[in-house]
Structure formats: C-alpha cells, structure tokens
Amino acid sequence: MPSVKVRDNEPFDVAMRRFKRSCEKAGVLAEVRSREFYEKPTQERKRKLAAAVKRNSRRLKKERSRFERLY
C-alpha cells in the first residue's frame, strides 16, 4: 500500500495528488478492478493470450512501417 508523508507547509491538495500518483504507479486501482469479480483460469489465460497477440501485432506493424520508410 503506497504511503505519503505530508511535508511541512505542504497543502493537502499537493499531498493528495502525490498519493494518487503513487497509487497509480503501484497499480492499486487496476488490481481492485481485476479482483472485483472472479475470473476463471481459462478466461484469464484467454485474456492474456489475446493481449499478447495484440501487442505482438502492434510491434510487427511498427517494424514493417519502419522498414517501408527506409527506401
């Protein structure tokens, strides 16, 4: 759990912003959302595989476009 120490003469808004940023970096909200409902192991594998395929296709698309521009 992220924690933030409020500095001397620091406004509450600034401390709150720092806390929100640290929570976002730690992935707290994403973790809560993913654990909100039970996901079967097969569904989790399918979701992760689909994300990997999407990432790979994006990477290949970037590589192809980079090589096309060279000539």
Swiss-Prot record:
Q: Which GO terms describe its molecular function?
A: structural constituent of ribosome
Residues in a coiled coil are: none
GO CC annotations, alphabetized: ribonucleoprotein complex; ribosome
GO biological process, any:
translation
> Which InterPro entries does this chain map to?
Ribosomal_bS21, Ribosomal_bS21_sf
Q: Which Pfam families match?
A: Ribosomal_S21 (PF01165)
Q: Which UniProt keywords are listed?
A: Ribonucleoprotein, Ribosomal protein
> Record's family?
Belongs to the bacterial ribosomal protein bS21 family.
| Protein name as it appears in the record | Small ribosomal subunit protein bS21
Give the gene symbol. rpsU
